[in-house]
Amino acid sequence: MIRRPPRSTPLYSSAASDVYKRQVVFNPKKSWGVDMLMLGYCSIIAIIILLMIGMAQFGALVKFWPYNLSLTLKHYHFEVAGLGWESFYNSVEMAFYTAVFGTVVIFVGAYVVEKIKSDEKLRGIVQFFALMPMAVPGVVLGLAYIFYIISKENPLNFIYATMAILVINTIVHFYTVSHLTGVTALKQMDKEFEAVSLSLKVPIYKMFFRVTLPVCLPTVFDIFIYLFCNAMTTVSGVIFLYSYDTTLASVSSIHLDEQGDVAGAAAMAMLIVYISFLVRGIHTIISTFLLKRTQAWRNI
């Protein structure tokens, strides 16, 4: 009976080194003074962030700030029509679609840029457009979509005021960071994989699904959660694109504050925080489980 060797054996170390030949593990020396200093610095930042979130949570629970500080859940009822739970559900739906479709499009695009060497000009063009969204504000993206799609003669006019245009705009808005993340992960893989697959006449798609995708699975998970959380909180990119049926939680929070319902706005903002924490927790559990089972060579 053949048993799998423990992770500490040279087999796993050899496998990891074969995949990432150019990587050298950095093991910093322990320094109690520096560690405590950095712990204190990070703790101060964490406390400030938690205080801001806690203040928003407190504002969402009090009856009438700052005159009546008794606690209540009535602000989560969202009495203003069109700015309540429907907006929250729309945001979750939009963020989910953005994360799923965006992860596929972005990682495949990064693979084309980094691994497909047949046409250097095409790779340069794709790389240029992949980096462009970083320099374009979300408001400009939203206005550009409106001016382009609102025309009745445009064949894409049917996606105007739908969930589809929100998803497409959000993917484009946050494309660059995710693209660079994917390219960085692909650069770390040894280029000999592609050379060997070509010499053995292995199709590109088999190489992608059997080697590249499993090795880069942590990066794929990171792209997914990045797109989801940013889609939940984005305002500038969607402020001109939503309709009455596709109002988002981030936009509703602003409108509630403009109408004087500060507590309702805080409650809506906290819903965004809740769902982001929840999805992040699920992402951590699933990714940890899958990585331990499929990537033992990483010495997790």
Regions found by a protein language model. Name each.
Residues 14-43, 121-123, 284-300:
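Transmembrane alpha-helical segments of polytopic membrane transport and secretion proteins
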Residues 3-4, 34-64, 80-187, 204-206, ...:
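Membrane-water interface segments at the C-terminal ends of transmembrane alpha-helices
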Residues 14-17, 64-68, 233-262, 296-300:
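Glycine-rich helix-loop "coupling/hinge" segments at transmembrane-helix boundaries
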